[in-house]
Amino acid sequence: MRGLRIAVPKGAIFEDALRALEAAGLPAGALRGNGRRLFHRAGGVEFIVSRPSDVPVFVEHGAADVGIVGKDVLEEQEPNVMELVDLGSGACRMVLAAPRERASQVERAIAHAEVVRVATKFPRTARRYFEEMGRQAEVIELHGSVELAPLVGLSECIVDLTATGTTLRENDLEVLDEISRSTARLIANRGSYRLRHAEIRGLLASVGREGRPVGG
């Protein structure tokens, strides 16, 4: 049987993920300084380095046994995986934001049930947010530079992730509402959890010292 295979996200929570795995005694430090290499073997463990949005895909379909990913990705994709531990790192917020000079106008439009255009990288999250309020929105999916959309007239507002709010402030965007909060989570493939129960439970016990158990 191959070694335990772990999917690690590139980007903002990459270092947090490595620290959590290293704290669990895994040789995750081997992933540092390896440039574009996306598959690693070290100490009997296999690591996949992928885009955050792809981590749940690898885990759900069994290409990885476990993975680390932000709660925002899980809420957007709703994958069929086990969510084991809230690692508490990589904290950020999903927010509704609009240009500062038009913020009150957008708030009034939403309050009066007018259809607003919303740009986002999280279309399911955005639709769910407006549906739960009983409001309608035209959701425009983008894959980057969401902050630009209301500045050039593509949308009235955005739904996006922010950690410090710096990018929003730099683009004169004001937060209208906080939709949810996100931290890094340890997830597992359901089949792997049964077949590799001892390995995954051992990992869970180690990383769980720094995190909070959640439902699967």
Swiss-Prot record:
CDD domains: PBP2_HisGs
Major subcellular site: cytoplasm
GO biological process, one term: L-histidine biosynthetic process
Top-level lineage group: Bacteria
Matching Gene3D superfamilies: Periplasmic binding protein-like II (3.40.190.10)
Keywords: Amino-acid biosynthesis, ATP-binding, Cytoplasm, Glycosyltransferase, Histidine biosynthesis, Nucleotide-binding, Transferase
GO molecular function ontology, one term from the record: ATP binding
The EC number(s) this enzyme carries: 2.4.2.17
Family matches, as Pfam families: HisG (PF01634)
Catalytic activity: 1-(5-phospho-beta-D-ribosyl)-ATP + diphosphate = 5-phospho-alpha-D-ribose 1-diphosphate + ATP
Gene Ontology terms: cellular component: cytoplasm
Localization: Cytoplasm
Top-tier EC class: transferase
Disulfide bonds: none
Biochemical pathway: Amino-acid biosynthesis; L-histidine biosynthesis; L-histidine from 5-phospho-alpha-D-ribose 1-diphosphate: step 1/9
Complex and partners: Heteromultimer composed of HisG and HisZ subunits.
Family according to the record: Belongs to the ATP phosphoribosyltransferase family. Short subfamily.
NCBIfam families noted in UniProt: hisG
Domain free text: Lacks the C-terminal regulatory region which is replaced by HisZ.
Function field: Catalyzes the condensation of ATP and 5-phosphoribose 1-diphosphate to form N'-(5'-phosphoribosyl)-ATP (PR-ATP). Has a crucial role in the pathway because the rate of histidine biosynthesis seems to be controlled primarily by regulation of HisG enzymatic activity.
Protein name from the UniProt record: ATP phosphoribosyltransferase
Species in which this protein is naturally found: Rubrobacter xylanophilus (strain DSM 9941 / JCM 11954 / NBRC 16129 / PRD-1)
